[in-house]
Amino acid sequence: MYMIFSFSAQTADESGQLSMLVSEKVVLLLGKLTSGNLDTAQVGVYADEIHFLVRKMAHFSEYLLLGLTLSLPLYVYRLRGFWLVLAAGLFCAGFAGLDEYHQMFVAGRSPALRDVVIDTAGSITGIYMTRIIGFIGRKTIF
């Protein structure tokens, strides 16, 4: 949760620079994997094209980790099935809403309902991953 809060506390310029750096690294990695020799201008063009996707995948990934790390202990303490999804899902969705509200007070940032939906989808994915891991673990370990 601290990691999410820290990223949300970055100004629009700081956040944009960080996600653009990640976009450039992705383009360079894909260029190496496909044996493409990309010059600096091409890297910039391709990075601009995937920048939005990288930003939204970062939202999804942060909350996927939150969903996993929140639901795993709950699962271990026998909160399972519908109640696990409900409790962890509501907590994560509420935190996503508060996170977007927090961005109202950061320079150049604004809240977006789309981001809350993406965040919630990421956390629900993490929660269901916990359920799958738990189901497989019960069948093989215990």
Where would I find each of the regions flagged by the language model?
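Small-polar-interrupted transmembrane alpha-helices in polytopic inner-membrane proteins
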Residues: M1-Y2, L84-Q103
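Membrane-interface loop-to-helix entry segments
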Residues: F52-L66, L113-A121
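Membrane-helix interface segments
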Residues: Y77-L86, R109-L113
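Alpha-helical membrane-protein architecture signal
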Residues: Y46, I50, A87-L90, R114-V117
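Short, charged juxtamembrane terminal tails flanking transmembrane helices
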Residues: R138-F142
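"…centered on the first transmembrane helix and the immediately adjacent amphipathic helix/loop
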Residues: M1-E62
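Membrane-interfacial alpha-helical segments at the cytosolic side of multi-pass membrane proteins
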Residues: E62-V76, A121-G137
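Interfacial helix-loop-helix junctions of multi-pass membrane proteins
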Residues: A96-T120
